[in-house]
């Protein structure tokens, strides 16, 4: 969740709900000013308009023709225990022009965004705010802190780049890199033994209806899982503006897709790759997908692979069992929720994120960092 300033202050001009196509120029100017990023012209339409889960709620506050603040709440389709997909919200870009911070613009925007979400029939909205704004959400705006996510790390090599990456978890973690790399290679060997001769992992340029069939098979296992249709996966990864994602499919001898993994390639000159999504029908397919992901990242020169998991979740347990190492105790980001329809089944599920199926694919950010 990109959040640029959330400081309360004096009354603010009223925000207006806008369509991205009608306000792209103003949104792009504000995006550049708030975040210092120059890719808004291609990122914002992709993010706000093109998701097969639905268009985002986008609010814009202007003084005259000048944009001073904006708020995006992205549509997500969530399935619960095999039921029909339900539209919910996930907060996205929340931005205030640097010259207009401290005026309460964010507070007004959030309140209106929640009313717009209620009007859309979304029973809940979730968010992953930065540390500066998390307390404002929960103390002033009616949000609840429901859990946290943490970044786990798999050490692929034992060199200086891996030691530098593990320093984030502390000095001892950095010193232990040779042992951690050896332990990781042992875990990868166990993964290969689990799937050897049973499935075949190959790179896939685009997801097909086989991904739809896989999702239908597994979606009933969790009380909260965002819909992973082929259309969504292609939008989220294949058509993403960064072009930094690569997918591998895991196939049974009969040609059915039993699992897949998606990795995010390291930024040029960097050594950190990411396992951003993985879905598997069983333990054999999981092993094949995870090894395909780690092998791809090592092949392109990554020293470590990272993956974010909800604390206490199935995905966190799988990462640990696969050889990923825990972060420093304080290295976490809060998950917050705003319940708009208390009687809805998802109002209960949203308060138990440890039961979710949630990977980096489910975050609002296009790329992990």
Protein language model regions, located:
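Secondary-structure boundary elements
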Residues: 115-123, 251, 255
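Short helix-adjacent coil turns
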Residues: 22-23, 104, 301
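A broad, structural surface signal
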Residues: 25, 29-32, 111, 115, ...
